[in-house]
Structures are given as structure tokens and as C-alpha cells.
């Protein structure tokens, strides 16, 4: 913005006798012969001005002409003419004159006075201007203040609502710099002068700040404001013209209940079966996918019999005698320990140990034209794991790509060659359970080992107490008591033989959990020197390691074998497992078996 000296007599005459304001407001006086009209230079240096208010504001004939170049101390020397669009800071510098009386040259009007000052008729579309010069006959720069009312509204409906920014845009506020920015109005005790001026000012008769300005015609809504997202460019264009490439429609649940009907897709998926029927691992399933076990020698059946048979013999011979002659608490407590032992055995044997889904990270197919001797993509990598013992320390642990399952194994995950599955946090494959011991069934395995040890010791002690009490009551020798109760004596021998093995496993795994390691990690660490052995997953001490393993909740299964099969599930095969060839490992991975036709599935 520039202030220029006018040499035109007409201009001086107009300056001395300014035209009256439309609202009757007094105009500021001229200072030192400088034109009271603040002219704004156009962005391109041309005299491009719009005459949008020529029909409402009297036309002024006073035009400031360019004088000689001003001196260095001149006011106009602070402004420069440029061809590029000015920034917000440059636009503010055109309207702010700190060297002169600001109240005499610049009085920003409030939104109410500015709307009344315009007085232009309503239009069907939002009026927007392209010139950024702050000219007096130009629209306001606020997008909300432009007229957006349709022609069908009456004059009463066109009444402009009051602005919410009156406190900061009112022209009679002299202490603009000292305004209170606190969200509460009681932070100061001294009342600002601007508050008194706002309270005592004379409000225009046609404005009422307490009235909610709404159009009487509710059928016709005003056009969208330029700030609305619905008024963006090409918003009214047909939807077919949109580029929908790489877009996917998200599914959402119904907001209201509908009639329960079986959809064709759901019925079709149910006809295809469940997920376990398409699983390609070396696993057998029972109970509709609820129970699973490795397709190997069923040693777990023998393990269950080793628990069931002695328990049955105890309740058949020693239990009734102990109930009536010593205490009923002995057989009851023995039954409770047996329940814990056998239930933990069932859970550890038939529960999903943590099978990782297959085909999640498939390698790209090999190009036939590529050199067959070329090195393929890497199958080993390192993953940084944050240590629980420090806030800043971390350690790299190796991870490997499983070519059988086509996945990058997470840390502590290994592929079991018996189950032919990648198991999360695999400890070992237990032949007594005929199942892998992983993250989801490790607690059941540890509970089975612990309770089987207690059960064997309980069996030994209760059977021996039966023989000794009977010998003392009858007054016979120990050999005669054994001859009378041979089965309890056999249970004493069985308990003495069965207790050491689960007891050693219990102590060994208690030691491993206290170190924060699995069986595989502990055995693999002995391949390195003692100085190179690290435990990145330890919690710092034995108690925390025990809590982290035995106190953590069991994670959900990844495979969901009981669910219905969905066509296109990459985790599963496209053909049911009963139609796939079996026993390819004894044939050196050469499939010499009959392959059924594709339509047989």
C-alpha cells in the first residue's frame, strides 16, 4: 500500500471535502496534504480495479496521480511494487501505517457494518474476487461473509447475522494490543476501555445479537459455503467419472436389524467345509477341528493310560480302605490331583500350540529365462529386539524364511519337522503328548509335568500308608501285609518308578523359565562360547520370568480351524486335505502317487 501526494486540484478539493459515508460515519481528516484515500497497488502493476459497488457508492473523481519519486524519508518509500502475489504479511503491511495516526487512516469495520456497507443484492452464487488489493469497493476476503443466499429469499430473510468476532473487529476499539486472550472473563480486575466502548456504543437498529437468524423458507436451503467440503471442485460431477483404481469398498455392519436369512455366499462356504479340512500340515483333527494332534505314532495314548490305569487301581483297592479306616480326605485329595493332571494332559495334547499361518510372504516366481545358478533372495535376516532389562539397550536376533510355510518366521518361532508347521515360541516337540509345546500350550505342559509328579508321589505315599497301617492294626509282618495287599504294593513300586522322570522335567523347565529361555534356545546356545551366549528375552530376574510365562493370558489361535472355509484364503489349500497325496517324505519327496482330477474336490 502506498500513499502518494496529489498535485491535481480536483483531487485536493475532493480530499478537503470528502464525500459523506453511507452509514453516516465521520471520515478521518487529511494529514499534511496526503490523500485520505489509501490506494492499493495491483499485483501486476496495472490499474485493475473492480466496480462491484459502483451502483451503491458514489463515484469518486479524485484519482491520485504519480508524483516525482519520493524522498528516502517519504512514507511511500516503505512500499515496493512487485509482480508476484504478495503474502499475507505484505498485504497487512499495505494497510497498517505505524508512522501516522492509525485511528485517522485505518479503522477496520466490524462484520455487521461491512455487510451493511455493501448493500448489494443477493446472488445465486458465491461472489469471489481474484484481486488481492485491499480496495474499498472490493468484496471482503472472508469466504463466509460473501453472499451465499439464493434469489428466492425475501428481504427479511436476507438479514445478515451478527459476526462472532465483534470484539476483535469493531472499529471503535483503540486498545487492540491489550485485549484479554484468556478463555475466562475474570482473569483481570481492571476493566478494559474497549469493553466499555462496546457496551455503550449505539448498535444499528437492524441488528440484534440475541436473535437466531434463520430463513423462514425451510424448503430451500442456501448454497454451500466455499468452506464446505461438498462445494469443492468437481463435487457435483457424476460418480462414474471418478478414478476408482486402487480403491476398495469397505464393508460395514447394518445399522438396523434385518431379517435373518442365509446368504448364498454363506451357504456356499458352509458346503465347502471348515478350515481344518484344507490345512496342509501334518496334523489330524477331531471334533470338527476342536482337537488336533500330530499325524505320528500315537504315543500320547500310552501316556494317558499310564495315568489312568494306576489311578483306577488306587480307587479300586486302596481308596475304599483309606476312606473307612484313615480319612476320606485322602482319596478325595487324590482325585483332585488326578483331575488336574489328566485335564492338563488333554489340553497340552490336543490344543493348538500356536501354528503360524502359511503363505503370508510368498517369494516371487522364478523367471525361466534367469540363470539357474544365480543366487536367490536371502532367507536369513536380523530383527532388533528391545531388552526388558534396559530402556535403551537392544539386541539383534536372527530370523529365517521358512520355504515350507512361505513365511518369515517371527523371533523364537521354529518349524517342527514332525508336525510340519511353524510354531510360535516353540519349546520342543513332545513325543509323550504327540504334539508340539509352544506358546499356547506351554502352561498346560508344565502343569501336566508338575501334577504328574505330585500324583506319582501321592500314589506312592497313599499306597504305602495303606500297607503300613494295615500291618500295625493286624499285628502281622510287612511281608504278610504285602501278601494281603499286592496291588497297593505294586502301586508303591509304580509310583517310585514314575515320579523321577516328570520330576526331572519339572525342575528342568522351572530352570529354563527362570532364565527366560526355551529348550531349543538353551541347547542352541551351547554351540557358542560361554562369553557369546545371550538371553535377549529375559525379564531381568527369575520371579519376573516366571510371571511372564505362567501369568500371561493364552493368545488366540491364528488358524481358526473350526470356522467355515472362505474361498481364496491364502493360508489354506484350495483342495481338501483328503485328496492331497500323503507320505511323500519316505519317497524322498518324489510324488509317485495318483493325483485325482481337479473336479473330485
From Swiss-Prot:
It catalyses: L-cysteinyl-[protein] + hexadecanoyl-CoA = S-hexadecanoyl-L-cysteinyl-[protein] + CoA. Autopalmitoylated. The keyword Endoplasmic reticulum applies. Keywords: Acyltransferase, Endoplasmic reticulum, Lipoprotein, Membrane, Palmitate, Transferase, Transmembrane, Transmembrane helix. The keyword Lipoprotein applies. Residues 198-223 have a biased composition (Basic and acidic residues). Residues 1-18 have a biased composition (Low complexity). The active site is at residue 430. Residues 74-92, 123-155, 179-195 have a biased composition (Polar residues). The chain crosses the membrane at residues 301-321, 326-346, 445-465, 487-507. It is found in: Endoplasmic reticulum membrane. GO terms for biological process: protein targeting to membrane. Residues 322-325, 466-486 are lumenal. Its EC number is 2.3.1.225. It is a multi-pass membrane protein. One of its GO terms (molecular function) is protein-cysteine S-palmitoyltransferase activity. Palmitoyltransferase specific for Ras proteins. PANTHER family: PALMITOYLTRANSFERASE APP, ZINC FINGER DHHC DOMAIN CONTAINING PROTEIN. Belongs to the DHHC palmitoyltransferase family. ERF2/ZDHHC9 subfamily. The DHHC domain is required for palmitoyltransferase activity. This is Palmitoyltransferase erf2. It comes from Emericella nidulans (strain FGSC A4 / ATCC 38163 / CBS 112.46 / NRRL 194 / M139). The gene is erf2.
